[in-house]
Design a protein with these regions (language model features):
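Bacterial Sec-dependent N-terminal signal peptides
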Residues: 1-40
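Function-determining sites in protein domains
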Residues: 36-218
Length: 218
């Protein structure tokens, strides 16, 4: 093999290596960006074993036995008691259920229930936000970790779901999590005004997630 051919092969190898590195970097960067901006799609139907039983307990204890009218969300700490909140279409109430111990580690738990009436228009805005968040979810988003809090959003009666895990501050998911936490706090004290005060944030974040939805179909 002459010197010129060796140089050409070396150049090709260098270019291919560089391209491979750039591809890996691009995927890593993309995953990082998505982890900050989107939820992660969650397919409960694929759960098996202990995880499946855990989801069944969540539905049974916190989400009206899985019989949901419209939208819902859960807050699932790694070690503390979980929360589930869903919309009761018949009474136009947000229903929050909280357990005193972590369901994963406890055979028996106590459930506390709280209710807060909201207007139909407010319910529609919350549903619109949740729908945009779930439909813009991406498998590139980081799904979860070992220690923290998992937040799950459910729409269409729980048919579609997506989640995030302890998102970083000032990200889209963190803004969504803040709304979930504020909704939970408002329902606990039956404060309809506090729910209504979240409307500007809800509308703003809905627009952001809808723009991410549009990106998926460009």
């Amino acid at each position: 093999m002459n010197k010129k051919i060796k140089q050409i092969l070396l150049l090709m190898l260098t270019r291919n290596t560089l391209y491979f590195i750039l591809v890996l970097f691009g995927l890593s960067f993309s995953a990082g960006v998505n982890a900050q901006s989107r939820l992660y799609p969650k397919g409960r139907e694929h759960s098996q074993g202990p995880l499946k039983r855990y989801h069944e307990k969540i539905d049974s204890l916190l989400l009206n036995n899985g019989k949901l009218d419209d939208f819902a969300f859960t807050i699932e700490p790694s070690f503390e008691g979980e929360q589930g909140c869903y919309y009761d279409n018949e009474t136009s109430e947000l229903v929050l259920k909280v357990v005193n111990k972590n369901i994963w580690y406890s055979a028996k738990v106590e459930v506390a229930e709280y209710r807060c009436s909201i207007s139909r228009s407010t319910a529609s805005l919350i549903e619109e936000l949740f729908s945009a968040a779930v439909l813009s979810s991406s498998y590139l988003a980081q799904p979860n970790g070992l220690d923290g809090v998992t937040y799950e959003v459910l729409i269409n009666g729980g048919y579609y779901t997506a989640e995030c895990w302890s998102p970083k501050k000032d990200t889209n998911c963190h803004k969504l999590v803040r709304i979930l936490e504020e909704l939970s706090a408002a329902v606990k004290i039956n404060d309809q005004v506090a729910v209504e005060n979240l409307i500007p944030e809800i509308k703003e974040l809905t627009t952001v997630f809808k723009e991410l939805c549009d990106c998926l179909f460009v």
